[in-house]
């Protein structure tokens, strides 16, 4: 399994976003941490990817496989927010996570069987957010 939500850390990020009192500011912070990092840590990468996935779900109605039962209802309820100003940062953060300076990418690269699928999944999200 190589999806955004195939990791416990991703669910921690989702729980934090769902509990956020200022989701736009929190997402921007998660993206900025990744974009500005010399080396992107595992947790930071997940927080940025989950933020990007939520934006993708809200703006593009993209359906992610997610074990959180109310994910789709919750993302629908976020349509009142304008996430479009964050799209470029999300795209940049995904690019950074796929770069050589990313712990998450390094770990996935060790999985010869699923690395390409994981990478393509993130590139597809990035492409949708560029539109």
Q: What positions do the PLM features span?
A:
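Short terminal alpha-helical segments
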Residues: 1-40
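Residue-level detector of well-ordered alpha-helical segments, enriched
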Residues: 26, 43-50
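Short, solvent-exposed segments of well-ordered alpha helices
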Residues: 38-45, 77, 81
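Amphipathic alpha-helical elements of HEAT/ARM-like alpha-solenoid repeat scaffolds that form extended
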Residues: 6-14, 48-55, 122
